[in-house]
Amino acid sequence: LQSKENLTASFEKFGIKAVMIGNTTKNVDLNIGKLRLSIPSMRKIWMATSSKLESYQTKKPLATIRAENIIKQPLKFNFPKKFNGKKPIPKQNNIKAAVVREKGSNSEREMAYMMDLSGFIVRDVHMTDLIEGRENLEDIDLLVAVGGFSNSDVLGSAKGWAGAFKYNPKAKSAIENFFQRPDTLSLGVCNGCQLFIELGLITPNHKKQPKMLHNDSGKFECIFTAVTIKTSNAIILNGLEGSTLGIWAAHGEGKFSFPQKEIKYQIPAKYLYSEYPSNPNGSDYNAAMLASEDGRHLVMMPHLERTIFPWNWGHYPDNRSDEVSPWVMVFENAYNWLANKS
C-alpha cells in the first residue's frame, strides 16, 4: 500500500504486523538494495510485448511512435485562475437546454447531469421526437449533441444521423431554425461533433467544408490526454484561456481535415502534444475543437462530460481538493451568457 500516513502504526493498533518496504522519491529510479533500475527502461521492457502486438493492429509507424513517446509526453496541467473547485451554486431559472441523441448515442446522462449542475432545465430529445414533430427546439436555448456510435457507424460516423436531419422535413426545419437564431448556443461532442461538421453548421459560409476522417492509426483510440485552450471567441470557453486540462478521448473517426489554411478557422483548443498518442487521431493543425465565427457554436472530439469530477480523470493533481473539475466552467459560461441575453 502507498500512503502519506504512517500505516505501520495503524496496523499495529489492530495487532497486524506490517513492514515498510520502501518510499517514493522524485527520481525516476527504482533502488532495491544495491540494485539500481531505470524506471523508463523497465517500463519499455514491460511494454515490449504490447508494442509488438500493437504493431499488427496499428498503421505503421504509429505503434513505434507510441512506444517512443510514452515517456516523452507527460501530462501537464495548468488550471484556470478563476476556477475555485466548488460545485456550482443551484440556480432558479427558466433557461432550457436539450440533449439530442440518436439510436446508438451514449454519455447523454453524464452530459445532462453536467448541464443540470450548472442550472439548466435539461430536456432529453431523441431524433424520433424531431422527425415526428413532438419537438421543434423553439424554446431551447442550448443544444448539445452527444457522443456515441449513432446507427452503429454503418454509413460512417454520424453520416446516418446527419441524414436523419437532412431528409426529414420537420427535423431539418428544427435544426436550421435553431442555428439561425442569434440568441442560442450549441455544443457537439464526439459523435455530436461529427454530426455538426457533416451538416456544415460550424462553418456555413465555407465553400469547402471540413471533414472528420478515420484516425491516422486506423483504429479506435481511447486515451486520457490533455488539451491546451487558446484565446478565442468561443463563448463557452471564456475564462479557460491559457489552461491545459486533462480529458478523455474515445473515437475511431476523430481526425479534423481542413481544406484551407489554419487562419481560416477558429480552433480554440489543441492537444498538449501534436504527436501520437497525445493527439490520438492526427488532426490537421493539432485541432481538438472547432468554433463558429461568432463563437456561439463549438464542436470537440474529446469528452468533457467524462471528466466532470477529479476522480473521473486518469490523473488529477494530488495537491488539489476540488469538488469538480474545471470543465464545469463550460456550462457555467453558457448559462451566464444566456441569462444575460434573456
Mark where each language-model region is:
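Generic beta-strand/beta-sheet core signal
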Residues: 1-2, 19-24, 33, 100-102, ...
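Short acidic/histidine-rich motifs immediately flanking catalytic phosphotransfer sites
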Residues: 136-144
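Amide-donor transfer/coupling interface in amidating biosynthetic enzymes
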Residues: 21, 134-135, 176-177, 209-342
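Intein/HINT protein-splicing elements and their conserved insertion hotspots or analogous self-processing inserts
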Residues: 3-96, 104
